[in-house]
């Protein structure tokens, strides 16, 4: 399933799940309106803004400090787009765990899709906690419909025998 990133709550949950899955201890900031991304690489470049931000200070590795924040900005069409420098991303904790910006965006998309399904498919009717990882690394979210429980009046009476007894006053 390929979708556009339009739901900020699902994007936030997807990013948080992806970071946790790869043991990247980073906070995802949410800003509305968009706020400026930090850039320690080129102070002369025009500032970039994003609505969801992973600060560079959370993306350092033992061998290198990250130079740029990673963000997602809502564009004029209402979808979120990745704002990241591919070179810096490949060097930081995200790149070390996931890969380049294309691979990162693909992984975000998978977690976003899972978050959308979990938001829209009622957990009272559907069990969606099982995620299968296939041989090729693809993730599959398995949805199974929960059985609908039917409780008869007889079962209610046996559970609480006095619940259905009414006394009539003379």
Model-derived segments and spans:
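Interaction-mediating elements
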Residues: 1-170
């Amino acid at each position: 399933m390929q979708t556009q990133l339009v739901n900020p709550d699902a994007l936030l949950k997807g990013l948080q799940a992806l970071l946790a899955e790869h043991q990247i201890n980073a906070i995802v900031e949410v800003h509305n309106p968009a706020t400026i991304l930090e850039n320690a690489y080129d102070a002369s470049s025009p500032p970039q803004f994003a609505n969801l931000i992973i600060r560079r200070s959370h993306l350092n590795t033992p061998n290198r400090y990250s130079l740029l924040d990673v963000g997602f900005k809502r564009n004029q069409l209402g979808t979120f787009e990745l704002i990241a420098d591919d070179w810096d991303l490949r060097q930081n904790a995200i790149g070390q765990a996931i890969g380049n910006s294309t691979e990162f965006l693909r992984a975000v998309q998978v977690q976003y899709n899972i978050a959308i399904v979990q938001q829209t498919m009622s957990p009272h009717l559907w069990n969606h906690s099982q995620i299968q990882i296939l041989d090729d690394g693809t993730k599959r979210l398995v949805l199974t419909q929960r059985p609908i429980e039917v409780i008869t009046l007889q079962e209610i009476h046996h559970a609480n025998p006095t619940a259905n007894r009414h006394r009539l006053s003379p």
